[in-house]
């Protein structure tokens, strides 16, 4: 009896083992394809599908173009039909704080009254200078004598301000400090300012401080020769000419060397 039970229990085992082996074989088929490493291509494909426009019929498209309907517009215009143009009418508000500040400053400067205290009409003769010094002396010092010392800094400031505003010339701070009488101011303007005002060659150059350039015409002696100034434009022109000549000589030398090498 025990032997029969053993045989009966042993028989179903091969069937189960075959079923398990078949289950494993079916499960392996799930992983038979190769893995796709480009995972982001799925999102790219979905995005392209969303923005893809349907293809229109050729006959309908030709008809729309002939009739001039809005549906026949180009693809670029259809994509941009819902976009606003960057024009001032489409902006709301006053912009950034910096732009607002610049507008306020521009408006304030344009509306501010500037005091043009320096005269635009400049004196050019000795007679005008004599009249100007006399007016400044009488108004600020109450005297006619031009060789009198200034009583204090206030009187000197009033005199120099009146003289500069009426003559149209600014006087350097060094001269304003060292000169002490109206006569000294008169001599300074007559010797330093009026000659350069009447002769542009004697004009003061800020790029070359204290540079008064003499010319050969100013000296009658035969043993004095003055070399005239060479401007930067003339220097550049001369330099370009020299470089062109050098380049030409080098090209000729190279050409002769090549001809000699070919003939050898």
UniProtKB/Swiss-Prot annotation:
Keyword DNA damage: no
Record localization: Mitochondrion
Record-level GO BP terms: mitochondrial translation
Main location: mitochondrion
Domain of life: Eukaryota
InterPro entries assigned: ACP-like_sf, Ribosomal_m50
Gene Ontology CC terms, in alphabetical order: mitochondrial inner membrane; mitochondrial large ribosomal subunit; mitochondrion
Keywords: Mitochondrion, Ribonucleoprotein, Ribosomal protein, Transit peptide
Transit peptide interval: 1-75
GO molecular function, one term: structural constituent of ribosome
A Pfam family it matches: Ribosomal_L50
Subunit structure: Component of the mitochondrial large ribosomal subunit (mt-LSU). Mature yeast 74S mitochondrial ribosomes consist of a small (37S) and a large (54S) subunit. The 37S small subunit contains a 15S ribosomal RNA (15S mt-rRNA) and 34 different proteins. The 54S large subunit contains a 21S rRNA (21S mt-rRNA) and 46 different proteins.
General remark: Present with 1350 molecules/cell in log phase SD medium.
Recorded family membership: Belongs to the mitochondrion-specific ribosomal protein mL50 family.
Known role: Component of the mitochondrial ribosome (mitoribosome), a dedicated translation machinery responsible for the synthesis of mitochondrial genome-encoded proteins, including at least some of the essential transmembrane subunits of the mitochondrial respiratory chain. The mitoribosomes are attached to the mitochondrial inner membrane and translation products are cotranslationally integrated into the membrane.
Protein's name in the database: Large ribosomal subunit protein mL50
């Amino acid at each position: 009896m025990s032997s029969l039970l053993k045989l009966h229990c042993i028989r179903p085992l091969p069937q189960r083992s075959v079923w398990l082996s078949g289950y494993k074989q079916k499960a392996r088929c799930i992983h038979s394809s190769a893995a796709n490493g480009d995972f982001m291509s799925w999102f790219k494909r979905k995005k392209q599908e969303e923005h893809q426009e349907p293809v229109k019929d050729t006959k309908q498209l030709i008809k729309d173009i002939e009739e001039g309907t809005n549906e026949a517009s180009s693809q670029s215009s259809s994509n941009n039909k819902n976009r606003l143009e960057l024009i001032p009418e489409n902006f709301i508000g006053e912009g950034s704080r910096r732009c607002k500040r610049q507008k306020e400053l521009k408006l304030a400067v344009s509306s501010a009254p500037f005091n043009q205290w320096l005269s635009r009409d400049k004196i050019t003769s000795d007679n005008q200078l004599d009249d100007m010094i006399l007016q400044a002396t009488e108004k600020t010092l109450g005297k006619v004598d031009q060789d009198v010392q200034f009583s204090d800094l206030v009187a000197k400031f009033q005199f120099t301000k009146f003289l500069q505003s009426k003559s149209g010339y600014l006087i350097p701070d060094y001269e304003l400090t060292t000169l002490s009488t109206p006569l000294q101011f008169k001599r300074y303007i007559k010797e330093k300012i009026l000659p350069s005002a009447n002769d542009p060659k004697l004009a003061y150059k800020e790029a070359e401080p204290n540079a008064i350039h003499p010319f050969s015409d100013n000296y009658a002696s035969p043993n004095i020769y003055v070399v005239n100034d060479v401007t930067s434009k003339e220097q550049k022109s001369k330099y370009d000419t020299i470089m062109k000549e050098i380049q030409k000589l080098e090209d000729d030398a190279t050409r002769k060397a090549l001809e000699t090498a070919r003939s050898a």
